[in-house]
């Protein structure tokens, strides 16, 4: 009886590995179709204000911020916001002013807090300096192409669209294995997974870029409606959809900086993100385990006690995973994050992060301790051992 059960388990694990390999192919195909779409033309190019909340001098910060200053767009303003007068990012902004004297830049330094979400509090302090009615809220670590604003505005002008967001790829800040592992997770799992979710009808708002009109923001309650939510992007997306408006995906794909140089630090970053996603879409998060086919293929080899067919399955899965990873990197026009030999470790690390996310709801982020609870993350003071 036990040998039969082992055989059944091995076959089930093997089928899961095949499903994961199939998802890798589907994700690559979805990306190719997305990249081949014809971008909608803008009916007009209204003035835009970019809101950039800052916190510290991050790796590649100046390069990322400079990419916003080189937009192929007629009229735009950038408002930078900080909450500490001694923030080292201020020196980066001084250099940007010298490099781009013709770009309209405003800097807001204000310690005033609004609710529990410090980023949203920063944005609330910044908003009065916004001169224009089209707003783009973008993370500080986004590296954007010169047509970034044109792409966002074109998507926002489509019928029934109230909010525009973007996919993003990963860009390692250092030539380290850890940096490449982090970029690979974004490029090979998050990005194609987000495209497949959209193909199945979901319209998630991805907080790295959020573009909307001032009128739409006011209709959903303004930034103050987000002030007590740490998953502010998801909440904003739901509020906009509640108005009968769509959350659209712009054609442009920025890159986010992957700053980590040590695996434990990367693990904690990915764990924080995993707990956030799990709190928002728990079923979809659990099913995302299929995305890591080499983990399931390796488990198949172990459970089958090294059966020949299991080794063949592992090799085939590895090949498919490697080809898809290389193809995705090529479509994104980024350097291959990982060699094919590192992919099993990447899948093992991803699965470890997923399983560890169920251990506790505690999330530590920039000095705050939070509990990941649906529908968002709410900061809370926790005694040792709680959560």
Features from the language model and the residues they span:
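N-terminal membrane-anchoring/stem segments of glycan-assembly enzymes
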Residues: 1-44, 183, 196, 325
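Membrane-embedded multi-pass helical conduit in multi-pass membrane proteins
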Residues: 7, 11, 15-18, 29-33, ...
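Cell-envelope/extracellular polymer assembly enzymes that use nucleotide-activated donors
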Residues: 46-49, 77, 235
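Short, acidic, metal-binding catalytic loop of nucleotide-sugar glycosyltransferases
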Residues: 66-75, 85
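Acidic donor-binding/catalytic loop of UDP-sugar-dependent glycosyltransferases
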Residues: 88, 138-155
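Long helical/loop segments within the catalytic core of UDP-sugar-dependent glycosyltransferases
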Residues: 95-128, 132, 151-220, 224, ...
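Short beta-strand-to-loop acidic/aromatic patch adjacent to the donor-nucleotide binding site
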Residues: 123, 132-143
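Acidic donor-binding loop at a coil-to-helix junction in glycosyltransferase catalytic cores
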Residues: 229-235
């Amino acid at each position: 009886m036990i040998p039969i059960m082992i055989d059944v388990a091995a076959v089930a694990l093997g089928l899961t590995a095949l499903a994961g390999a199939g998802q890798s192919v589907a994700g690559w195909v979805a990306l190719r179709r997305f990249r081949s779409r014809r971008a909608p033309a803008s009916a007009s190019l209204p003035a835009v204000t970019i809101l950039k909340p800052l916190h510290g001098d991050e790796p590649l910060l100046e390069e990322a911020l400079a990419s916003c200053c080189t937009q192929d767009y007629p009229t735009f303003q950038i408002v930078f916001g900080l909450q500490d007068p001694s923030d080292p990012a201020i020196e980066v902004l001084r250099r940007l002013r010298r490099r781009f004297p013709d770009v309209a830049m405003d800097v807001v330094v204000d310690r005033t807090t609004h609710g529990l979400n410090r980023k949203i509090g920063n944005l609330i302090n910044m908003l009065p300096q916004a001169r224009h009615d089209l707003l783009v809220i973008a993370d500080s670590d986004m590296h954007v192409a010169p047509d970034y604003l044109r792409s966002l505005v074109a998507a926002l002008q489509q019928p029934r669209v109230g909010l525009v967001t973007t996919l993003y790829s990963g860009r390692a800040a250092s030539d380290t294995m850890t940096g490449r592992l982090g970029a690979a997770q974004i490029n090979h799992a998050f990005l194609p997974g987000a495209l497949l979710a959209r193909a199945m009808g979901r319209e998630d708002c991805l907080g790295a870029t959020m573009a909307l009109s001032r009128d739409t923001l006011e209709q959903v309650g303004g930034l103050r409606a987000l002030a007590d939510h740490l998953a502010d992007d998801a909440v904003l997306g739901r509020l906009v959809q509640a108005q009968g408006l769509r959350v659209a995906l712009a054609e442009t794909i920025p890159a986010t900086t992957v700053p980590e140089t040590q695996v434990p630090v990367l693990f904690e970053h990915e764990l924080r993100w995993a707990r956030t996603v799990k709190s928002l879409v728990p079923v979809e998060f659990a099913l995302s385990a299929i995305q890591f086919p080499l983990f399931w293929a390796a488990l198949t080899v172990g459970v089958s006690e090294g059966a020949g067919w299991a080794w063949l399955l592992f090799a085939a899965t590895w090949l498919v995973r490697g080809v898809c990873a290389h193809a995705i990197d090529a479509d994104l026009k980024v350097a291959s994050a990982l060699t094919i030999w590192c992919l099993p470790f990447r899948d093992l690390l991803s699965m470890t992060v997923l399983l560890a996310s169920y251990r506790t709801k505690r999330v530590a982020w920039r000095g705050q301790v939070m509990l990941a609870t649906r529908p968002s993350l709410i900061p809370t003071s926790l005694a040792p051992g709680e959560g």
